[in-house]
């Protein structure tokens, strides 16, 4: 007769399994080797969710807002002091022809007009800088 096959499991093993099953029931997360997952939330989870709901204020009038306000709506336009808005300094004379060309291509009303170029015919316009192209597209 085979004596090893008919042995009962020892009490220590039974107690260990029972303790493990109790632990699994109290543990809030599902373990992959459990037989059946419980559909109800553990009591500690219910207690936490109720207490958090009680602490939060009820906010019924939440309105979506824009992070960048539409001009004319929302915050008023800020009028900066005069010291912050000062006209740019006059450009150096060596780049005057470039600025004239830019003014012709991109006219703006808020910039002051540059004085006309007054150089002798035999002198180059600038020293060391190439002349502007003869034809303006």
Swiss-Prot record:
One CC-aspect GO term: cytoplasm
Organism the protein comes from: Mus musculus (Mouse)
Domain of life according to the entry: Eukaryota
Compositionally biased region (Polar residues): 119-129
Alphabetized UniProt keyword annotations: Cytoplasm
Stretch list, region Disordered: 110-137
Protein name: Uncharacterized protein C3orf22 homolog
Compartments it resides in: Cytoplasm
InterPro entries named among the record's database cross-references: C3orf22
